[in-house]
From Swiss-Prot:
The lineage of its organism: Bacteria, Pseudomonadati, Pseudomonadota, Gammaproteobacteria, Alteromonadales. This is 3-deoxy-manno-octulosonate cytidylyltransferase. Pfam families: CTP_transf_3. Activates KDO (a required 8-carbon sugar) for incorporation into bacterial lipopolysaccharide in Gram-negative bacteria. It catalyses: 3-deoxy-alpha-D-manno-oct-2-ulosonate + CTP = CMP-3-deoxy-beta-D-manno-octulosonate + diphosphate. Pathway: Nucleotide-sugar biosynthesis; CMP-3-deoxy-D-manno-octulosonate biosynthesis; CMP-3-deoxy-D-manno-octulosonate from 3-deoxy-D-manno-octulosonate and CTP: step 1/1; Bacterial outer membrane biogenesis; lipopolysaccharide biosynthesis.
Length: 254
């Protein structure tokens, strides 16, 4: 199975400007992401950026990049521009790996591509991990997903779902949660033709309320298949403090 990986990488981050170029063990962050994509077995890896400094860094380590417009409001829109520039066929699989995920397991990238390949009814695929911590179940920054019996997403939300009526009504016994709680892992595989359709879909009210762009797909009646990640990835890096915390984790290898 062949698949592409596109890595959207922006320099202008409000909380962490220049994040893709921050050095980790002597290499810029974007290179670590690129290396994980290569290790996944992807046949084509491209960094999509609107910044010449990032493009130069990618060129310096021998990577491939595409310069995109600076007007995009989401990484998916940036992907769509690259799909057009590369003349990708409509059935080609494209995996979107965020440029601030230097520690993402290569296995997860391969898994999400395989997930889409094996589910022809879906236009998108993604991953999730089980939530075992009560605090995470109630954390709005941890995006939850509920699935149907075939593994297709029914809804993504920042709220706590499903709501365990018997347990949650009594705050004194919220010490454990059941088996239905899943945290969404922000990696997506798309069919190239669908990416071009997606950017022309009207945004949904639910997407805007939750600030979750994948809800646009469900709103318009398309399917997203969700697989349980074989490896739980560490959190992404949004701030310098996140980077310090993750680098202090002795379990991470470079």
């Amino acid at each position: 199975m062949n698949f592409n990986v596109i890595i959207p990488a922006r320099y202008a981050s409000t909380r962490f400007p220049g994040k893709p170029l921050v050095e980790i063990n002597g290499k810029p962050m974007v290179q670590h992401v690129y290396d994980r994509a290569i290790e996944s077995g992807a046949s084509n890896v491209i960094v999509a950026t609107d910044d010449a400094r990032i493009a130069k860094a990618v060129s310096d380590f021998g990577g491939k990049y595409c310069m995109t417009g600076a007007h995009h409001e989401s990484g998916t829109e940036r992907l769509a521009e690259v799909v057009e520039m590369q003349d990708m066929l409509s059935q080609e699989i494209v995996v979107n790996v965020q440029g601030d995920e230097p520690f993402i397991p290569a296995e997860n990238i391969q898994q999400v591509a395989e997930n889409l390949h094996h589910h022809q009814q879906a236009e998108m695929a993604t991953l999730a991990v089980k939530i075992v911590d009560v605090e995470e179940a109630f954390n709005p920054n941890a995006v939850k997903v509920v699935l149907d019996k075939q593994g297709y997403a029914m809804y993504f939300t920042r709220a706590t779902i499903p709501y365990d009526r018997a347990r949650f009504l009594d705050e004194d016994i919220i010490d454990e949660i059941g088996d239905y709680y899943l945290r969404h892992v922000g990696i997506y595989a798309y069919r190239a033709g669908f990416i071009k359709q997606y950017v022309n879909m009207s945004p949904s009210g639910l997407e805007q309320i939750e600030s979750l762009e994948q809800l646009r797909v469900l709103w318009h009646g398309e399917k997203i298949h969700v697989d349980i990640a074989r490896k739980t990835p560490p959190a992404g890096i949004d701030t310098p403090e996140d980077l310090k915390r993750i680098l202090a984790d002795p379990s991470l290898k470079f």
